Structure formats: C-alpha cells, structure tokens
Regions:
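Conserved coupling/interface region of RecA-like P-loop/ASCE motor cores
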Residues: 1-48, 62, 189-190
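C-terminal accessory regions
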Residues: 121-211
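Accessory C-terminal helicase-associated subdomains
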Residues: 37-133, 181-185, 193-198
Length: 211
C-alpha cells in the first residue's frame, strides 16, 4: 500500500508512552506524560458529539487536500455502527459498504484516494477497525470508544473471557490511539461518563470550536 507520506510521527515515542500508561490505567503517570507533549505538535481531544468531530476535521483540513482524517473503531464494538460509525460488512470473500448499495469496499482506497473521493477516509462514511489500520497512519483519526472497554472501580475492564482475549482488546485500543500524525479525537458516546471522566483526569481536552 502506497500512502505517499511517512507513517512515522515526530512525536510517536511520547504519544506511545502516554497511550501505554492510559491503557494500563496508570492515570497519574499518563497525565504527567501528556503534559510534556507539545500541544502545538500533537492535538488530543475528546467529544461526546460525533458530528462536531467530523465538522472539526473538515474545517481544519479544508485547504490541505493532502491531509487524511477518518473514523476508526474496535472490531468488538458493534454498537458504534448505530451511532454514526458503521463498518464495512462482510459478504462472500469481500466487504461491502454498509448502506446496502452492494458497492464493494476496499481498504486501499480508504487510505489513498483524494480527500474529495467518495471512497476516501475523508468522506467519513465507513469506519475501519484495528485490523485494517495496524501499522498505518492518517493525520487525524476519529476514534470511537466502544462498549468493549469500560472504566469500573478505578481500573479498565476489557471485554473477554480469558487473558488472551483481554490482551487483544488492550492491544486494539493501543493501536487505535496511535494512528494519528497530527493528533486524535476520541468520540465517547452518551452514557459513557466513566470514560469521559478518565480523559479529564489525564488532561485530554474537550474538542474546541474551530477558529
């Protein structure tokens, strides 16, 4: 896959360390690390309104057609599909757009097509999962926080019936939160105040109005 740009963020090391602490539930350490990341270089936000996240990305990169933004979600969070982050659906040996049109969906155009192309990630029509984006980056991902990761009694509880499956969920969110070159926006659905409180504790800001 030819992304035509480097997939290494200049703040990748610092962001990776922060994400590791966040996912481990070590919130004080995560907050201390976040405060050291230059905010002018890497922007981390959360929002409870998906439409605002989409509007922010479109406005921020309106005059930068080379930039890429899109929606990414956990493969074990189907509830996000009903909230505006649908995934491509599996058919016989192929994936299809979730609108029922029968149009085939492929991951390469999602990353590579021009920002005004309907198959581009910038169309904000289809969300991809950790399996589609592992090892790849876009400039500003909108990360959907799913029902498979909950903050209960001051620690994360990830969906899974054994240590191996839980490890997969932990790694999933580690992947999702480290796909951005310019930053990330986490969409936290209504009713998930547990997650919003965590993001406030580690000093991640609410998505601002675009100037």
């Amino acid at each position: 896959m030819d992304l035509k740009v480097s997939i290494r963020s200049h703040t990748a090391g610092e962001v990776s360390n922060f994400v590791n602490k966040l996912i481990a539930g070590e919130l004080e350490e995560a907050a201390a690390l976040l405060d050291k990341i230059p905010q002018q270089d890497f922007h981390m936000y959360y929002t409870r309104d998906l439409s605002r996240a989409k509007e922010y990305c479109r406005g921020k990169y309106d005059h930068q057609p080379e930039k890429r933004y899109g929606m990414i979600v956990s493969s074990k969070a189907p509830g996000l599909s009903k909230l505006g982050m649908p995934r491509a659906t599996w058919g016989y040996k192929a994936k299809y757009y979730p609108d029922g049109s029968g149009r085939r969906w492929k991951v390469a155009p999602w990353f590579n097509e021009k920002s005004n192309h309907p198959d581009s990630c910038c169309a904000l029509e289809v969300a991809i999962t950790e399996f589609d984006c592992q090892g790849l980056e876009i400039d500003m991902p909108i990360v959907g926080w799913g029902e498979d990761a909950k903050w209960i009694n001051d620690h994360w509880e990830f969906m899974g019936t054994d240590d191996e499956k839980i490890s997969y969920r932990i790694n999933c969110y580690r992947v999702l939160l480290t796909r951005g070159r310019d930053g990330f926006i986490v969409f936290i659905p209504e009713g998930r105040d547990d997650v919003a409180e965590v993001f406030e504790r580690v000093h991640i800001e609410k998505l601002p109005e675009l100037e």
